[in-house]
């Protein structure tokens, strides 16, 4: 009985040239795997006989990434969550097919929160703004940890006050935190972490 190999996910961001984080997306997964297997076996040929290699296993082609590190850009009214282009401006990747469904469904809610609270995205070229990143982690139970990376403590109490409303909009929220990263560097997180919920960790069942 033949087994149909999983195909690479369809991604409108890749097709439009908006995002090139997955440069081999147009190559069929079995072909990608064959190339990788060939390279590895060639590198280890002196140490591993060819007959000892087992057939490689294909992983899930999409919905396998349980953590999203989203750079925030754009404006308060129209924030982008994703990456920055070569000029430091935002490219929205909320529809990235690699993220688990719980994360993809949470990102629009968090974007609305940014607008509702007036959190100004940090603009790299001008070095102005407060909100640098939104980090979202999903557990196997679809519970979420959300962390806002801010330039300062300026909006800390605003986020704390919004927690009840956010829980209603995002019932799977388990942990909400703020990280302070006040330097103009390509560093996602700073040294100061402030947890706004009673829970301070996400249960990851094995």
Annotate the PLM regions:
Residues 1-206:
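Accessory RNA-recognition modules of RNA-modification enzymes
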């Amino acid at each position: 009985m033949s087994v149909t190999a999983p195909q690479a996910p369809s991604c409108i961001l890749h097709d439009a040239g908006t995002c090139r984080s997955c440069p081999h997306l147009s190559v069929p997964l079995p072909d990608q795997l064959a190339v990788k297997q060939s390279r590895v076996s060639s590198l280890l040929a002196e140490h591993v006989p060819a007959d000892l290699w087992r057939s490689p296993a294909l992983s899930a082609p999409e919905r396998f990434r349980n953590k999203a590190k989203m750079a925030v850009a754009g404006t308060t009214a129209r924030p982008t969550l994703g990456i920055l282009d070569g000029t430091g401006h935002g490219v929205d990747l909320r529809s990235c097919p690699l993220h688990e469904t719980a994360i993809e469904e949470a990102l629009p809610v968090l974007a609305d929160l940014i607008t509702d609270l007036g959190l100004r995205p940090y603009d790299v070229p001008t070095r102005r703004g407060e909100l640098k990143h939104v980090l979202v982690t999903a557990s196997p139970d679809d519970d979420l940890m959300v962390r806002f990376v801010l330039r300062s403590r300026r909006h800390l109490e605003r986020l704390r006050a919004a927690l009840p409303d956010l829980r209603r909009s995002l019932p799977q929220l388990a942990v909400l935190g703020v990280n302070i990263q006040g330097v103009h560097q390509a560093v996602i997180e700073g040294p100061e972490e402030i947890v706004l919920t009673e829970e301070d960790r996400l249960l990851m069942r094995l």
